[in-house]
Amino acid sequence: LGTKYAKKPLELDIPITIAGMSFGALSGQAKEALGRGASAAGTSTTTGDGGMTPEERGQSKYLVYQLLPSRYGMNPDDLRKADAIEVVIGQGAKPGGGGMLLGQKINDRVAKMRTLPKGVDQRSACRHPDWTGPDDLKIKILELREITKWKVPIFIKIAGARPYYDTALAVKAGADVVVLDGMQGGTAATQEVFIENVGQPTLACIKPAVDALQDLNSHREVQLVISGGIRNGGDVAKALALGADAVSIGSAAMIAIGDNNPKWEKEYNKLGTTAGAYDDWHEGNDPAGISTQNPKLMKRLDPVKAGKRLTNYLKVMTLEAQTLARACGKNSLHNLEPEDLCALTVEAAAMAGVPLAGTNWIPGKK
């Protein structure tokens, strides 16, 4: 990832990366586990709102540093330690919206990193303070390249709102990689009305983004990473067949390292839910010690064991996708193409731009 401009592009072993999830939203142990698991699988992990922790940097072979509108935890020295920089413009679960970290997660360490009072709700802005449009973004990217001496790739993360035009603008601004996040992406930092009603489904975003890259003669030169609801090898194979270069996972990685572990069933019951259905990650009461800053709960998560679980999950996802590629007669995942796909509904056919099963008809295609 990042072969167009960066002197040191990310060379990953698998086409699955770990998306940005902040220290603060997650415990330090969880961030360490993500770093360990991703590194053992030969892929990257991403910081999130709130900055870089020593545990995460120390255990991550490839670490992507997110630059967000809030600038919470932003440290130029940490930025130089990163293997790539991701400028976050939008998130699939809340395009056009900011975020919130509830006060019960703002302990002494989080407060110090974010320069905030302890125990007070933290609100994140939705707009960057030092640029307002694509022309400014181009200048910002050049600034970041100078800071890092043009060594590391610059990612631009956009939400699935206007994928064709947003992808085109990111490419013209000088992005090495476009990360496109569909509305199925998870978050614990916005209201339900956003989660349910704002943005486009991940499937509907891929083709317009690929079309934009092709129209600019930049497909494969500027890489496309798809996120938002990716769960298994089938999702990976479909995204790559539609033209993506890689995918990114967030909520699935949390489950892999031990969230919703049946071991804590009784405690999930006390919270009014059950293992396998718990998603109140914003409240800071996660019995598994992942989405919490409660010292008693955090101690329950062993980063070494949790990292191994994530590694196993990533390897199995990759093997599943490879198996599907072989079934299509391909010797590489990256040889998958739209011709290997068909859709089971008219809606899916129209969104993905592939024929309806049993026909040659692509709805909406002239």
Task: Show where each model-derived region lies.
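A short, mixed-charge helix-start or loop-turn motif at secondary-structure junctions
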Residues: G20, Q122-C126, Q191-I195, K299-P303
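Glycine-rich phosphate/ribose-binding loops and adjacent secondary-structure elements
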Residues: A125-N294
